[in-house]
């Protein structure tokens, strides 16, 4: 009954307009003061232990910084050019190229909103110019942008790994096949819609342009090889990989592509050595660091408040109570996965993915292990639910970002995204009930997961 009061407080604060992160933290602290035997000092200890014990959380600010440099530079334009060269000659090819570009940029950014902004700000106008409706273009980008948290490296996967103590490397591998499958399913749906609506196709650009576009985009796409190759080659940990990614992104944006900083200013005639030193204090670098810092603080503030709620639930033994009640009720794996999907789909409509995972993952993880469900399978399924949550109202983040990029009303974006959400629901069913889609690659390359807790 006390826990019901806690969740009513959280919902009540949200309804009166209190930010979600503050609602989680404030409700938890008030609950501790009024209903729990635990002290507030234990909250501070829990937060310290959570961040000190989860070294992988340090990857989040570095991945955000890498994403910021990649978004600020002209990487997105080069990726879009390459994607159009590959699939643009199909009917509906420009929309399919948008999905492919989102898939490639997702592998660089690890963030859905960043993917929508970087790709959508360029291709939506191009699609409209080539005979696509604004609604069609916005709906495609809104959904394809969600691949930013499914295709590795992914910030949300790092959060899940930290919340459940599973391997970040396994989670990244687990997202490869589902990410490719989701992108292919969206492109097939676009092709079918294009045939029905007789949408335009681009002429084949030729092999020379294809190779030139690939060469131009290769410096940016090499980041994926560095991150994943470095992790699975044993060169560095996921956290170190994130730091390397940030440094590499800074180097590529400033010195190779020269899309920002003093090298982008053609009127700057100072010696090269002077320009190199100017790069580190240039206004573009400062602005990128500032924006990445703002996003990092916002995300970690949400995670910190979610950790307080997680602490309260743990103190009240809620995970153990839920596990015991579900197992004693004879709940099987199929029914359990349905319950988790429904819970996450509802929660994803109101909460940011990282905060929701911090709360829900520790609750359902022990039950999943007891039922013999692979932790990587569970993690990828939860990430897919977060994808759908980002494109469903009332607070789906991708909906707001797409509305801003496409200059459309929120309701029009919701209507535009709805047909493609059906594709994502079909994809969720596949990921939920065909576990090898997410477990085959990590098991093949790294062996079976060993649970130690």
What are these regions (language model features)?
Residues 1-453:
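Alpha-helical transmembrane segments of multi-pass membrane transport proteins
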